[in-house]
């Protein structure tokens, strides 16, 4: 029997022809995929955007921050948009327009919907997707407010336990990392001048920060012994890493392919393991509910669900809410710790003044107390200036239009559009910050003396010129916990260690990716206990 192809006279195709034809077809599909419509009538910023979006979209995969800076410089009194691989992103610069949209209800302009798209919650964390029914975010906000009230009460043992957990976690992670570095050939690579005999140790900064912040965050969320469980802690830290990574992978594929691609990604498996652990923990707590007082965020959330039976939330809803909180809390806090340590190590001229303030506040309010931390205005200022100088996200106030929205000046935002306001360019704007390109560690400490600016100079303060934690009703409710975590880390390292960048080198360069600016995750610092130095002098 003849094969079907034998009935037709196909020309013989060489390999080069097949490759060229295939590449052409893929290229056409790719360009059509990028040829999404421009729905909003504002200027488009990017290379070659007058003719096609694809070149600017590809460049913005890594360098969107430059496009946002360019748009702000040209159209800072109105708005602009930039192309990405999947959509146009609209940036509202005018302050009056920003105020108009930032507090519009979520049924109209939704923060949760844009986060669902940004981090692909439909596939990676389906229980928190925009379409899913979730425990209200206000519950977590109330829980964090309750914990903050406890921290501010001298009679409540919470903050003392919080500080003790930091100390234990820091010491354990330092020992683990030093042992690993001493046994690794990487610690003895060519060019290193490290001298362990005199107390110096090379420590990778981001892994140290991530584990210590993870330990503190899980203590606040789940208490002991779960925060001290190495397997659980590693899983939490891993989850905070795989969600943004896997989301980037998924967003690069058309929607039809995502159900297949997600099957080979890590985030759903890690999420499933975390959910199983937390459901077991929740059931265990319910069995001993009568004998254990409410002590952490999980207890608070369980109590809220129990008080609202008509809401029909179950243990799985609680577990998924807590998993989402883990994701939201870990990486941004850890990165701020890393940036601050890098700035301190490369700017030793600040150390004496900071240490003098730390000693004075401990003497006045007691070592390790919340009152002492809250009175360290120079420490707070240095961290806030670090945040200003190294802003994680070039954008803020993200919203997805679920309905058409029209500003008072007539600009229409059609349904399905994504809007932001520029964030990082504001920190370079001389209208808001004097000498913005100069790092001034005590900039915000001096601002406290200004009656008009004093309320906005604290690390946790939010306004239109400082949107690291958002602003308005979607401002991050966990920012007070973040402030305490970062301050504990900075104070402990300053007070107890000599430290510098590896090989006495310059500050490790930041790593831009799209709208984000990340610290060098692999960079090491050298640490030496101060008592070891004194012994060797």
UniProtKB/Swiss-Prot annotation:
Top-level lineage group: Eukaryota
This enzyme's EC code(s): 1.-.-.-
Inducers of expression: Expression is down-regulated when the stress-activated mitogen-activated protein kinase (sakA) is deleted.
Metabolic or biological pathway, per its Swiss-Prot or TrEMBL entry: Secondary metabolite biosynthesis
Subcellular localization, as worded in the UniProt entry: Membrane
The keyword Heme is annotated on this UniProt entry: yes
Membrane topology, record value: Single-pass membrane protein
Main subcellular location of this protein, as a coarse class: membrane
Protein name listed in UniProt: Cytochrome P450 monooxygenase ltmQ
Coiled-coil regions listed: none
Pfam families documented for this protein: p450
KW Secreted (keyword) present: no
Entry-listed glycosylation sites: 182, 188, 310
Native source species: Epichloe festucae var. lolii
Molecular functions (GO terms): heme binding; iron ion binding; monooxygenase activity; oxidoreductase activity, acting on paired donors, with incorporation or reduction of molecular oxygen
Transmembrane segments: 10-30
Alphabetized UniProt keyword annotations: Glycoprotein, Heme, Iron, Membrane, Metal-binding, Monooxygenase, Oxidoreductase, Transmembrane, Transmembrane helix
Alphabetized InterPro entries for the sequence: Cyt_P450, Cyt_P450_CS, Cyt_P450_E_grp-I, Cyt_P450_sf
Functional description taken from the UniProt entry: Cytochrome P450 monooxygenase; part of the gene clusters that mediates the biosynthesis of lolitrems, indole-diterpene mycotoxins that are potent tremorgens in mammals, and are synthesized by clavicipitaceous fungal endophytes in association with their grass hosts. The geranylgeranyl diphosphate (GGPP) synthase ltmG is proposed to catalyze the first step in lolitrem biosynthesis. LtmG catalyzes a series of iterative condensations of isopentenyl diphosphate (IPP) with dimethylallyl diphosphate (DMAPP), geranyl diphosphate (GPP), and farnesyl diphosphate (FPP), to form GGPP.
GO cellular component terms given for this protein: membrane
Record-stated family: Belongs to the cytochrome P450 family.
Disulfide bond positions: none
Residue sites binding heme per the record: 476
Named cofactor requirement(s): heme
Phenotypic effect of disruption: Accumulates the paspalane 13-desoxypaxilline.
């Amino acid at each position: 029997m003849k094969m079907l192809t034998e009935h037709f006279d196909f020309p013989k195709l060489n390999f080069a022809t097949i490759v060229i034809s295939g590449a052409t077809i893929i290229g056409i599909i790719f360009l059509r995929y990028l040829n999404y419509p421009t729905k909003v009538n504002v200027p488009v910023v990017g290379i070659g955007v007058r003719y096609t979006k694809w070149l600017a979209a590809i460049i913005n995969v890594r360098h969107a921050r430059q496009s946002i800076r360019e748009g702000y410089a040209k159209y800072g009194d109105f708005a602009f948009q930039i192309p990405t691989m999947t959509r146009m992103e609209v940036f509202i610069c005018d302050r009056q327009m920003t105020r108009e949209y930032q507090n519009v209800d979520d049924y109209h302009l939704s923060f949760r919907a844009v986060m669902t798209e940004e981090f692909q919650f439909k596939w990676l964390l389906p229980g928190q997707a925009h379409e899913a029914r979730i425990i209200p975010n206000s519950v977590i906000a109330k829980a964090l407010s309750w914990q903050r009230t406890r921290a501010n009460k001298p009679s409540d043992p919470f903050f003392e336990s919080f500080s003790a957990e930091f100390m234990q976690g820091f010491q354990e992670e330092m020992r683990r990392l030093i042992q690993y570095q001493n046994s690794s050939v990487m610690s003895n690579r060519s060019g290193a001048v490290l001298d362990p005999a005199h107390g110096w140790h090379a420590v990778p900064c981001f892994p140290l920060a991530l584990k210590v912040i993870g330990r503190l965050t899980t203590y606040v969320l789940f208490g002991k012994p779960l925060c001290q469980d190495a397997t659980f802690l590693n899983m939490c830290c891993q989850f905070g890493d795989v969600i943004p990574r896997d989301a980037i992978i998924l967003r690069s594929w058309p929607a039809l392919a995502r159900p297949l691609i997600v099957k080979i990604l890590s985030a759903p498996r890690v999420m499933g393991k975390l959910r199983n652990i937390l459901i077991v923990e929740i059931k265990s707590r319910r069995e001993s509910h009568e004998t254990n007082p409410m002590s952490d965020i999980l207890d608070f959330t369980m109590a809220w669900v129990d008080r609202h039976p008509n809401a029909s939330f179950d243990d799985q809803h609680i577990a998924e809410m807590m998993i989402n909180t883990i994701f939201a809390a870990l990486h941004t806090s850890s990165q701020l710790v890393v940036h601050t340590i890098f700035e301190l190590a490369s700017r030793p001229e600040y150390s004496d003044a900071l240490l003098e303030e730390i000693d004075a506040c401990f003497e006045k309010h007691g070592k390790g107390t919340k009152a002492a931390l809250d009175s360290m205005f120079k420490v707070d200022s240095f961290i806030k200036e670090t945040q200003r100088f190294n802003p994680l996200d070039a954008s803020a106030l993200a919203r997805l239009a679920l309905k058409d929205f029209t500003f008072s000046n007539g600009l229409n935002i059609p349904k399905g559009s994504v809007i932001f306001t520029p964030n990082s360019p504001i920190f370079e704007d001389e209208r808001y910050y004097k000498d913005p390109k100069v790092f001034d560690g005590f900039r915000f400490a001096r601002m406290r003396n200004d009656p008009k600016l004093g309320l906005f100079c604290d690390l946790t303060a939010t306004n239109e010129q400082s949107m690291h934690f958002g602003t308005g009703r979607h401002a991050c409710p966990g920012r007070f916990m973040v402030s305490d975590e970062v301050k504990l880390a900075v104070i402990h390292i300053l007070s107890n260690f000599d430290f510098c960048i590896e090989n006495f080198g310059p500050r490790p360069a930041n790593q831009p990716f799209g709208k984000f600016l990340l610290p060098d995750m692999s960079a090491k610092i050298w640490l030496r206990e101060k008592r070891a130095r004194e012994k060797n002098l």
